């Protein structure tokens, strides 16, 4: 029996419907209630609970995981488990956010009287403003109602995408309001590529001083080409006798110099064609800061590394290829 074929027309139709749903979400979403929810969380020292059933529950779990990585006191609860003992976690004033597209999810509605008896603050996150869940809640965040991707409008697809967008929006509101630092996030997320990027220091990834190509101000461009070839870094660092950084001469500088001076460039001193005061970074700086410097509006492939801003002694060289091999790009 032949395998079914994937139709290009079907692919384009699905992608078009996804784009249409996301575009509609951004056009129709009103952030006022989401901002109110963020303010409630910021003013609350207790727990913030999230729940949902089915795919909405998966979205709630993901949001909780993001918030926990930002040091928020967030927990997910199953509505069934809540009624089998987990209510003991809920204290007066705690915030409980319930995800339900329809606002009629019976498992969530069953928890409402018990949560109210604990004097919790109920927040409905729904697409149906006149639903029972919305009517019973203290705050209602309305997500624009979007059609699902299947022809029956039943399979949670576009609706959960919009829930995810809302969840990330809420998390980033809290992130910016709290002023979460790179150090804090790194301590919460020490493993994997994210942990490496958040916690790594420049000195962990740089070429050491012994592997840095050096030249001096009076050296000729012709000599620098020999150094280029010997080290293969695509640049030379120009230093004074104490190895203080004076400038950098890259393969890009060489191309520009050839365009300006032609063959005469080989007899010029590096001082005439180098980039003075190049972008650089100290060895104890966060690798994430170095990446920002390298990937700015005019990207560079290398950064000279200094001991500190005051002495400006070159102690290493940071190369984009090293960061790419480490999976940081």
Curated annotation (Swiss-Prot):
Domain CBS: 206-265, 274-329
Cystine residue pairs: none
Lineage: Bacteria, Pseudomonadati, Chlamydiota, Chlamydiia, Chlamydiales
Sample GO molecular function, one term: isomerase activity
Keyword Repeat: yes
InterPro entries in the cross-refs: CBS_dom, CBS_dom_sf, KdsD/KpsF-type, SIS_dom, SIS_dom_sf, SIS_Kpsf
GO biological process, one term: carbohydrate derivative metabolic process
Family assignment from sequence similarity: Belongs to the SIS family. GutQ/KpsF subfamily.
Residues noted as binding ATP in the record, renumbered to the chain: 52-57
Transferase recorded as keyword: no
Organism of origin: Chlamydia pneumoniae (Chlamydophila pneumoniae)
Protein known as: Uncharacterized protein CPn_0526/CP_0226/CPj0526/CpB0547
Record's keyword terms, sorted: ATP-binding, CBS domain, Nucleotide-binding, Repeat
SUPFAM superfamilies, per database record: SIS domain
Domain SIS as annotated: residue spans: 37-180
Pfam families in the cross-refs: CBS, SIS
């Amino acid at each position: 029996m032949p395998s079914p074929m994937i139709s290009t027309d079907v692919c384009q139709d699905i992608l078009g419907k996804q784009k249409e749903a996301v575009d509609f979400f951004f056009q129709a979403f009103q952030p006022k209630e989401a901002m109110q929810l963020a303010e409630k969380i910021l003013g609350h020292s207790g727990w913030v609970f999230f729940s949902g059933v089915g795919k909405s529950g998966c979205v709630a779990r993901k949001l909780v995981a993001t918030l926990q990585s930002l040091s928020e006191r967030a927990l997910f609860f199953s509505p069934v488990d809540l009624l089998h003992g987990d209510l003991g976690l809920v204290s007066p004033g705690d915030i409980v956010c319930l995800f339900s597209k329809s606002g009629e999810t019976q498992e969530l509605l069953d928890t409402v009287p018990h949560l109210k008896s604990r004097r919790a603050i109920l927040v409905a996150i729904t697409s149906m403003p006149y639903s029972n869940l919305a009517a019973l809640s203290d705050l209602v965040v309305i997500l624009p109602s979007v059609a699902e991707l299947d022809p029956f409008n039943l399979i949670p697809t576009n609706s959960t995408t919009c829930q995810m967008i809302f969840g990330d929006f809420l998390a980033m509101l809290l992130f910016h309001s709290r002023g979460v630092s790179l150090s804090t996030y790194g301590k919460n997320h020490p493993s994997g590529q994210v942990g490496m990027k958040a916690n790594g220091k420049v000195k962990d990834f740089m070429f050491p001083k012994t592997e840095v190509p050096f030249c001096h101000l009076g050296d000729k461009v012709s000599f620098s080409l020999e150094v280029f070839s010997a080290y293969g870094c695509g640049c030379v660092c120009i230093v004074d006798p104490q190895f203080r950084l004076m400038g950098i001469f890259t393969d890009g500088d060489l191309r520009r110099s050839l365009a300006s001076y032609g063959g005469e460039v080989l007899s010029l001193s590096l001082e005439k064609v180098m980039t003075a005061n190049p972008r650089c970074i100290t060895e104890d700086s966060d690798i994430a800061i170095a990446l920002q410097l390298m990937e700015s509006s005019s990207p560079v492939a290398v950064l000279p590394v200094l001991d500190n801003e005051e002495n400006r002694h070159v102690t290493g060289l940071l190369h984009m290829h090293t960061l790419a091999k480490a999976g940081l790009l």
